[in-house]
Amino acid sequence: HLYHYDGFTTGVFVLRAETVKSAAKLFYRLLDCADAPEGEKEPLFNLFSYWKDGEFRSVIVFRSRHRSHHYFSEGPDHLTMSPGCADMGGVFIVPVEEEYERLSPELLEEMVREVSITEEEEGMIINRLTRTQPRLHVGIMSAKEIEFEILSDGAGARKAVMREGKIEYDGA
Protein backbone atom coordinates (compact mmCIF):
# COMPACT_ATOMS: atom_id res chain seq x y z
CA HIS A 1 0.00 0.00 0.00
CA LEU A 2 1.23 3.48 -0.84
CA TYR A 3 -0.12 6.58 0.88
CA HIS A 4 0.40 10.32 0.62
CA TYR A 5 0.81 12.07 3.98
CA ASP A 6 0.18 15.82 4.17
CA GLY A 7 0.59 16.55 7.88
CA PHE A 8 4.27 17.58 8.17
CA THR A 9 5.54 19.03 4.90
CA THR A 10 5.11 18.47 1.18
CA GLY A 11 6.43 15.35 -0.52
CA VAL A 12 5.81 12.80 2.25
CA PHE A 13 4.73 9.30 1.21
CA VAL A 14 4.26 6.17 3.32
CA LEU A 15 4.43 2.60 2.08
CA ARG A 16 3.42 -0.64 3.75
CA ALA A 17 4.20 -4.10 2.41
CA GLU A 18 4.25 -7.66 3.70
CA THR A 19 7.33 -8.72 1.72
CA VAL A 20 10.67 -7.14 0.89
CA LYS A 21 9.91 -7.61 -2.81
CA SER A 22 6.58 -5.76 -2.54
CA ALA A 23 8.21 -2.96 -0.55
CA ALA A 24 10.96 -2.59 -3.16
CA LYS A 25 8.45 -2.53 -6.02
CA LEU A 26 6.39 0.19 -4.33
CA PHE A 27 9.49 2.19 -3.45
CA TYR A 28 10.88 2.13 -7.00
CA ARG A 29 7.46 2.90 -8.47
CA LEU A 30 7.31 5.99 -6.24
CA LEU A 31 10.90 6.97 -7.05
CA ASP A 32 10.18 6.69 -10.79
CA CYS A 33 7.40 9.27 -10.39
CA ALA A 34 9.68 11.93 -8.89
CA ASP A 35 12.04 14.12 -10.89
CA ALA A 36 15.77 13.99 -10.25
CA PRO A 37 17.61 17.31 -10.02
CA GLU A 38 19.62 18.22 -13.11
CA GLY A 39 22.82 16.21 -13.23
CA GLU A 40 21.61 13.69 -10.63
CA LYS A 41 20.56 10.07 -11.19
CA GLU A 42 17.76 10.02 -8.62
CA PRO A 43 15.54 12.44 -6.71
CA LEU A 44 16.65 13.84 -3.35
CA PHE A 45 14.87 12.16 -0.45
CA ASN A 46 15.12 10.95 3.11
CA LEU A 47 14.05 7.38 3.82
CA PHE A 48 12.88 5.97 7.15
CA SER A 49 12.17 2.22 7.19
CA TYR A 50 11.11 -0.15 9.93
CA TRP A 51 9.29 -3.42 10.62
CA LYS A 52 6.07 -3.40 12.63
CA ASP A 53 3.12 -5.76 13.05
CA GLY A 54 4.34 -8.17 10.37
CA GLU A 55 4.97 -5.62 7.64
CA PHE A 56 7.68 -3.42 6.24
CA ARG A 57 6.95 0.29 6.58
CA SER A 58 8.78 3.19 5.00
CA VAL A 59 8.35 6.94 5.05
CA ILE A 60 9.84 8.79 2.08
CA VAL A 61 10.32 12.56 2.29
CA PHE A 62 11.24 14.13 -1.06
CA ARG A 63 13.53 17.14 -0.92
CA SER A 64 14.39 20.00 -3.23
CA ARG A 65 17.82 20.63 -1.70
CA HIS A 66 20.10 19.72 1.20
CA ARG A 67 20.21 22.98 3.14
CA SER A 68 18.06 26.05 3.76
CA HIS A 69 19.35 29.55 3.05
CA HIS A 70 20.11 29.99 6.78
CA TYR A 71 23.10 27.66 6.51
CA PHE A 72 24.75 29.91 3.92
CA SER A 73 23.70 33.23 5.48
CA GLU A 74 26.04 35.42 7.48
CA GLY A 75 25.17 37.33 10.62
CA PRO A 76 22.06 36.80 12.77
CA ASP A 77 20.24 34.85 10.03
CA HIS A 78 22.95 32.13 9.99
CA LEU A 79 22.18 28.69 11.44
CA THR A 80 24.56 25.74 11.38
CA MET A 81 21.54 23.44 11.32
CA SER A 82 21.27 21.52 8.09
CA PRO A 83 18.05 19.52 8.10
CA GLY A 84 19.20 15.94 7.70
CA CYS A 85 17.30 12.69 7.99
CA ALA A 86 16.64 12.98 11.73
CA ASP A 87 15.43 16.57 11.34
CA MET A 88 13.13 15.64 8.46
CA GLY A 89 11.79 12.92 10.74
CA GLY A 90 10.91 15.52 13.38
CA VAL A 91 13.99 15.32 15.66
CA PHE A 92 15.91 18.55 15.14
CA ILE A 93 19.64 18.51 15.84
CA VAL A 94 20.99 21.92 16.91
CA PRO A 95 24.80 21.92 17.25
CA VAL A 96 25.13 25.46 18.68
CA GLU A 97 23.41 26.38 21.96
CA GLU A 98 22.87 30.04 21.00
CA GLU A 99 21.05 28.92 17.85
CA TYR A 100 18.82 26.68 19.94
CA GLU A 101 17.70 29.73 21.93
CA ARG A 102 16.75 31.54 18.69
CA LEU A 103 14.62 28.72 17.29
CA SER A 104 10.87 28.98 17.03
CA PRO A 105 8.22 26.72 15.48
CA GLU A 106 7.94 29.24 12.62
CA LEU A 107 11.69 29.15 11.92
CA LEU A 108 11.79 25.35 11.93
CA GLU A 109 8.76 25.25 9.62
CA GLU A 110 10.47 27.70 7.26
CA MET A 111 13.64 25.60 7.15
CA VAL A 112 11.74 22.39 6.46
CA ARG A 113 9.61 24.08 3.78
CA GLU A 114 12.75 25.43 2.04
CA VAL A 115 14.30 21.97 1.66
CA SER A 116 11.03 20.20 0.80
CA ILE A 117 9.63 19.89 -2.71
CA THR A 118 6.98 22.37 -3.82
CA GLU A 119 3.25 21.65 -3.86
CA GLU A 120 3.48 21.62 -7.66
CA GLU A 121 6.21 18.95 -7.62
CA GLU A 122 4.22 16.93 -5.09
CA GLY A 123 1.15 17.19 -7.34
CA MET A 124 3.17 15.87 -10.29
CA ILE A 125 4.26 12.83 -8.27
CA ILE A 126 0.67 12.15 -7.20
CA ASN A 127 -0.56 12.59 -10.78
CA ARG A 128 2.06 10.18 -12.11
CA LEU A 129 1.15 7.63 -9.43
CA THR A 130 -2.59 7.81 -10.01
CA ARG A 131 -3.02 8.53 -13.72
CA THR A 132 -4.60 5.88 -15.86
CA GLN A 133 -3.65 4.86 -19.35
CA PRO A 134 -6.24 4.78 -22.13
CA ARG A 135 -7.63 1.34 -22.81
CA LEU A 136 -6.78 -0.28 -26.10
CA HIS A 137 -9.50 -2.37 -27.68
CA VAL A 138 -8.44 -4.70 -30.47
CA GLY A 139 -10.77 -6.98 -32.31
CA ILE A 140 -9.70 -10.48 -33.26
CA MET A 141 -8.54 -10.56 -36.86
CA SER A 142 -7.78 -13.52 -39.03
CA ALA A 143 -6.05 -13.43 -42.41
CA LYS A 144 -2.81 -14.58 -44.05
CA GLU A 145 -1.66 -10.95 -44.09
CA ILE A 146 -2.76 -8.01 -41.91
CA GLU A 147 -1.66 -4.45 -42.56
CA PHE A 148 -2.02 -1.88 -39.76
CA GLU A 149 -0.60 1.40 -38.46
CA ILE A 150 0.44 2.42 -34.94
CA LEU A 151 -0.39 6.11 -35.02
CA SER A 152 1.69 7.16 -32.02
CA ASP A 153 5.05 6.00 -33.40
CA GLY A 154 4.68 7.67 -36.82
CA ALA A 155 6.43 4.78 -38.59
CA GLY A 156 3.64 4.28 -41.12
CA ALA A 157 2.00 1.07 -42.24
CA ARG A 158 3.19 -2.20 -40.70
CA LYS A 159 2.52 -5.73 -41.83
CA ALA A 160 2.07 -9.07 -40.08
CA VAL A 161 2.15 -12.15 -42.32
CA MET A 162 1.44 -15.82 -41.55
CA ARG A 163 4.23 -17.83 -43.18
CA GLU A 164 5.06 -21.51 -42.57
CA GLY A 165 3.01 -21.60 -39.36
CA LYS A 166 4.76 -18.56 -37.86
CA ILE A 167 3.91 -14.87 -37.66
CA GLU A 168 6.35 -12.62 -39.46
CA TYR A 169 6.21 -8.98 -38.34
CA ASP A 170 7.84 -6.30 -40.50
CA GLY A 171 9.98 -8.93 -42.20
CA ALA A 172 11.31 -10.52 -39.01
Task: Tell what function each PLM region has.
Residues H1-Y169:
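Conserved His + Asp/Glu catalytic blocks
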